[in-house]
Amino acid sequence: QIWPNPVAGGPPFLFAERAERDAPFAVLSYGHGDVVRGYAAQWHAGLEPWTMVVDGDRWYGRGTADNKGQHSINLGALQQVLAVRDGQLGYTFKLLLEMGEEVGSPGLREVCEQHRDALQADLFLASDGPRVAAERPTLFLGSRGGVNFDLRIKLRPAGHHSGNWGGL
């Protein structure tokens, strides 16, 4: 389903659900499909933001690291679960994708309030964010949100260490 954005001029939301009869629980996965500008001149030789390039086990393309690659992994995992469980997940799966995350998520709160019942779930999965190391999967609990602020500082006249005792 395509849900219109309740904020005028805001991009739409995509909602999908695979409901299974007598499912003991529901999983809601969230992510975004929008990307930042391509910055074509900043890509390495042989790569560009407009063409997907697969090099061994790496994918290069606009949005592959934020957030489309994560969606590909999650949907591929669901496909594998369905394959080994005779077409059944054993739970209800819901997916909410927004198209305005890179510009502050206009309308996200409102659309979640409007569709509260449809978004009801027992587990929330958001595959977005940093990893401790590339080869080490990392689980963060509660890392969503954004803050905008202006910072004014008054520097001391000399150089100081920026650690715990430096006062910066």
Segments (PLM) and residue ranges:
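Acidic/His- and Gly-rich active-site-bordering loop/insert found
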Residues: 1-64, 84-91
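Flexible loop/turn segments at secondary-structure boundaries
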Residues: 10, 35-37, 102-105, 131-134, ...
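Acidic-enriched catalytic cores of C-N bond-cleaving enzymes acting on peptides and small amides
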Residues: 132, 141, 148, 161-168
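Acidic/histidine-rich catalytic neighborhood of metal-dependent amide-processing enzymes
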Residues: 58-59, 63-142
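Mobile "lid/hinge" segments at catalytic clefts and subdomain interfaces of large enzymes
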Residues: 149-151, 155
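Short, flexible loop/turn motifs enriched in small residues
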Residues: 43-46, 143-147
